[in-house]
């Protein structure tokens, strides 16, 4: 069985505040590995660095990455090229059209990776408010990742490693006729030993 076929059965999601940096780097890494992945933000709006610290660029979710890219170029191409924002947006627009808000999405995922505690809390609260009518379990996993280019890349690789470990355990449990949920904490423990600087929090939720 090819890697892409092995990965096609599970649905993954990555979530950060603005659906631009951490969630999109993890989205890219998982997609390139053959996973079925979507990504979202939980913030009230998309916020990116501005020309001054006290004046960030603020956009509505759904604003195309192309439009954001062109707006920043019109402000100062040199500034946004230097701080890596244009490179980030260029990556993003190759993956999908626009940043999406978690609360507007209605897809069902097996695993949701959030990149900071407030995003984790927001996802868990939203799923609880939806009422679990489908009675489908979702594994919500928070990995604290600093919001900068370098840490987004480190976090993306770490999330891919965890996705691979979870996938392998799912297939092993299906083969052996055992319950995956009985072994998920063992997977987290093994992963956390490899990545002690990326604290992990977990909660089960229901669609």
From Swiss-Prot:
Reactions mediated catalytically: O-phospho-L-seryl-[protein] + H2O = L-seryl-[protein] + phosphate; O-phospho-L-threonyl-[protein] + H2O = L-threonyl-[protein] + phosphate
One of the Pfam families matching this protein, by short name: Ssu72
Record carries keyword Hydrolase: yes
Gene3D superfamilies in the cross-refs: 3.40.50.2300
EC number: 3.1.3.16
Record note on quaternary structure: Component of the cleavage and polyadenylation factor (CPF) complex.
Role, per record: Component of the cleavage and polyadenylation factor (CPF) complex, which plays a key role in polyadenylation-dependent pre-mRNA 3'-end formation and cooperates with cleavage factors including the CFIA complex and NAB4/CFIB. SSU72 is required for 3'-end formation of snoRNAs.
Protein's name in the database: RNA polymerase II subunit A C-terminal domain phosphatase SSU72
